[in-house]
């Protein structure tokens, strides 16, 4: 068989060379007619001349004395070769204008040419054939046809494609349908019916690749045809609307300063419409951007929803905008099969407010300085401020309160404390500030009961002034009786306040009443020589703790002179 085939090849090459110089209408390589088939499956290929390039069919051409010749060029080769029609079991054969492969092999890939000619006429066209492998899930580099089904709208059928002519109508092949790798059996809304696959009310979940495998018997040999297609569920025609422009809109204003970058997006929604040509474009002052003397950049992008609704965006940008650019009219346009829409962008020059940086800084600094000064003044002179307020706006506590004394003085009965109370405290509080003091040893009558008179004096007083010293805390003294009575009166009735003056430091407080009093009351400390000056902090603290009382007895100068002279002798 090898020798005859070689002789035939040489004869064919001779024919091709003998006609090489003759005129032949060569339609070239028709890449649009590329044919893809699976390995080890039959392929049936018609000569494209009679389908797209010539006005007559094969029967007419044959009866006119024209001969159809087939040859091919192997993949990655340049040499044209005759097709071997003498392979075992007629694996490759020709029937009229059809070239048959039963089945294909990977090395059948190449460019195939069909030539129609006689002694006076010649016409030929080439087309590529690609034999591809498939895996167990029918995945392959093949370009898949797409079937679009309207969402939730009636019953849709798809048919296993490109199987006509492979077997006579008397043969009933078996057909198995798959979605991806899964055979379609008892699916919710998908039902196979032979060559057809029915979708009952399609849903987005039906999106995917569907494969039909057709099996038939020919001349005792079993052949398989595998056809895969993509199903996409798309928006219903009843939901089709004209374009909707998201941006620009009336709510957004593009304010820019000259020299800044201006960026305006034209973002448009298109509902799915079969075979609709969706487009968007900009106009500037009614002209195309290319016709305007402005350096404009336009970038377009497209995204799709699960039902193939489309969102298309064109971003218009001007790197450095000028005042003239900010006065132009920028309009976004959109069009689909349902209608058109347009929306102008609001662009204006930003108004720059006057900058008061120096003034604001000075004002802020002055405010901070004033606050700091006020805090310092209050911290240093708060006693003077309280006394000033009491002197001019305070309410006299002595009016109609039924009290006879302003202060009851409680102290330890020894020479040092008595001298401090009788000379220093009494001298300033009575003579300087005009308060009326109750000093038990001075104001009590002889022969009276000490306990009763002490309680009576305390009840008649507005304040209880306790002079603390180590001798004060000794158990069983009259001073402790006075302290307990004052604290009890303050706690139960609230008509007396206790003032603690520390004459000398007390290290160990064993009296619980005194401990409790020191923990909740402010202690005014006597600091010896430092505290003798009548305008000092000690006397101001003590005066703040005293009852508010109007006493015009002394002028300021008299008070100062008397206090200082009286204290100097203490």
UniProtKB/Swiss-Prot annotation:
Q: Choose one Gene Ontology CC annotation of this protein and give it.
A: plasma membrane
Which positions are glycosylated?
Answer: 57, 107, 111, 118, 157, 196, 209
Q: How does it sit in the membrane?
A: Single-pass type I membrane protein
| Stored InterPro entries | Ig-like_dom, Ig-like_dom_sf, Ig-like_fold, Ig_sub, IL-1_rcpt_fam, IL-1_rcpt_I/II-typ, IL-1RAcP-like_ig, TIR_dom
Q: Which GO terms describe its biological process?
A: cytokine-mediated signaling pathway; inflammatory response; interleukin-1-mediated signaling pathway; interleukin-33-mediated signaling pathway; positive regulation of interleukin-13 production; positive regulation of interleukin-4 production; positive regulation of interleukin-5 production; positive regulation of interleukin-6 production
Q: Which residues lie on this side of the membrane: Extracellular?
A: 21-367
Matching entries from PROSITE patterns are given as: IG_LIKE (PS50835), TIR (PS50104)
Q: Which domain of life is it from?
A: Eukaryota
Enumerate the UniProt keywords alphabetically. Disulfide bond, Glycoprotein, Hydrolase, Immunoglobulin domain, Inflammatory response, Membrane, NAD, Phosphoprotein, Receptor, Repeat, Signal, Transmembrane, Transmembrane helix
Domain Ig-like C2-type residue range list? 21-128, 141-230, 243-348
Q: Which residues form the active site?
A: 482
Q: In which tissues is it expressed?
A: Highly expressed in hypothalamus, in the dentate gyrus of hippocampus, cerebral cortex, cerebellum, liver and lung.
Name the enzyme's class: hydrolase
Leader sequence segment: 1-20
Cite the CDD domains for this sequence: Ig1_IL1R_like, Ig3_IL1RAP
What's noted about domains in the record? Answer: The TIR domain mediates NAD(+) hydrolase (NADase) activity. Self-association of TIR domains is required for NADase activity.
User: Subunit details for this protein?
Assistant: The interleukin-36 receptor complex is a heterodimer of IL1RL2 and IL1RAP; the association is inhibited by IL36RN. The interleukin-1 receptor complex is a heterodimer of IL1R1 and IL1RAP. Associates with IL1R2 to form a non-signaling interleukin-1 receptor complex. Interacts with IL-33-bound IL1RL1 to form the minimal interleukin-33 signaling complex with a 1:1:1 stoichiometry. Interacts with KIT (independently of stimulation with KITLG/SCF). A mast cell-specific KITLG/SCF-induced interleukin-33 signaling complex contains IL1RL1, IL1RAP, KIT and MYD88.
Q: What is the purpose of this protein?
A: Coreceptor for IL1RL2 in the IL-36 signaling system. Coreceptor with IL1R1 in the IL-1 signaling system. Associates with IL1R1 bound to IL1B to form the high affinity interleukin-1 receptor complex which mediates interleukin-1-dependent activation of NF-kappa-B and other pathways. Signaling involves the recruitment of adapter molecules such as TOLLIP, MYD88, and IRAK1 or IRAK2 via the respective TIR domains of the receptor/coreceptor subunits. Recruits TOLLIP to the signaling complex.
This protein is called Interleukin-1 receptor accessory protein
The organism named in the record is Rattus norvegicus
Ranked from the top, the taxonomy reads: Eukaryota, Metazoa, Chordata, Craniata, Vertebrata
């Amino acid at each position: 068989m090898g020798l005859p085939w070689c002789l035939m090849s040489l004869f064919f090459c001779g024919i091709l060379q003998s006609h090489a110089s003759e005129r032949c209408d060569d339609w070239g390589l028709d890449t649009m007619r590329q044919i893809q088939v699976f390995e080890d499956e039959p392929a049936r290929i018609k000569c494209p001349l009679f389908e797209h390039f010539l006005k007559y069919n094969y029967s007419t051409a044959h009866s006119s004395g024209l001969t159809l010749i087939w040859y091919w060029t192997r993949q990655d080769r340049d040499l044209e070769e005759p097709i071997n029609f003498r392979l075992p079991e007629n694996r490759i054969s020709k029937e009229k204008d059809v070239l048959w492969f039963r089945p294909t092999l990977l090395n059948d890939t190449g460019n195939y040419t069909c030539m129609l000619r006689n002694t006076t006429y010649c016409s030929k066209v080439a087309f590529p054939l690609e034999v591809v492998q498939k895996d167990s899930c029918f995945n392959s580099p093949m370009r898949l046809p797409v079937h679009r089904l309207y969402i939730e709208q009636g019953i849709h059928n798809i048919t296993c494609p490109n199987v006509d002519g492979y077997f006579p109508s008397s043969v009933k092949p078996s057909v198995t349908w798959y979605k991806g790798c899964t055979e379609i059996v008892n699916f919710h809304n998908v039902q196979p019916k032979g060559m057809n696959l029915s979708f009952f009310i399609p849903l987005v979940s039906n999106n995917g690749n569907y494969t039909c495998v057709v099996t038939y018997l020919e001349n005792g040999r079993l052949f398989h045809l595998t056809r895969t297609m993509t199903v996409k569920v798309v928006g219903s025609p009843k939901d089709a609307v004209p374009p909707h422009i998201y941006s620009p809109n009336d709510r957004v204003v593009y304010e820019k300063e000259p020299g800044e970058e201006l960026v305006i997006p034209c973002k448009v929604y298109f509902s799915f419409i079969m075979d609709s040509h969706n487009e968007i474009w900009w106009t500037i002052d009614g002209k195309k951007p290319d016709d305007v003397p402005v350096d404009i950049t336009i970038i377009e992008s497209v995204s799709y929803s699960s039902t193939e609704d489309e969102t298309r965006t064109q971003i218009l940008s001007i790197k450095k905008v000028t005042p003239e650019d900010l006065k132009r009219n920028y309009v976004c346009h959109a069009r689909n099969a349902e209608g058109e829409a347009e929306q102008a962008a609001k662009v204006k020059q930003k108004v720059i407010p006057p900058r008061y940086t120096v003034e604001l800084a000075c004002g802020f600094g002055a405010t901070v300085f004033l606050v700091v000064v006020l805090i310092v003044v209050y911290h240093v002179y708060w006693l003077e401020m309280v006394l000033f307020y009491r002197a001019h706006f305070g309410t006299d506590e002595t009016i109609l309160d039924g009290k006879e004394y302003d202060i009851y003085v409680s102290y330890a009965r020894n020479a040092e404390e008595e001298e401090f109370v009788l000379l220093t405290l009494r001298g300033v509080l009575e003579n300087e500030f005009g308060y009326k003091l109750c000093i038990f040893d001075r104001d009590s009558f002889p022969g009276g009961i000490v306990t009763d008179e002490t309680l009576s004096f305390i009840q008649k007083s507005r304040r209880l002034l306790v002079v603390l010293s180590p001798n004060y805390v000794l158990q069983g003294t009259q001073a402790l009786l006075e302290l307990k009575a004052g604290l009890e009166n303050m706690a139960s009735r609230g008509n007396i306040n206790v003032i603690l003056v520390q004459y000398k430091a007390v290290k160990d407080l064993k009296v619980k009443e005194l401990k409790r009093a020191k923990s909740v009351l402010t202690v005014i400390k006597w600091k010896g020589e430092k505290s003798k000056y009548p305008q000092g902090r000690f006397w101001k603290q003590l005066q703040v703790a005293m009852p508010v009382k109007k006493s015009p007895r002394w002028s300021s100068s008299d008070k100062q002179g008397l206090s200082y002279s009286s204290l100097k002798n203490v």
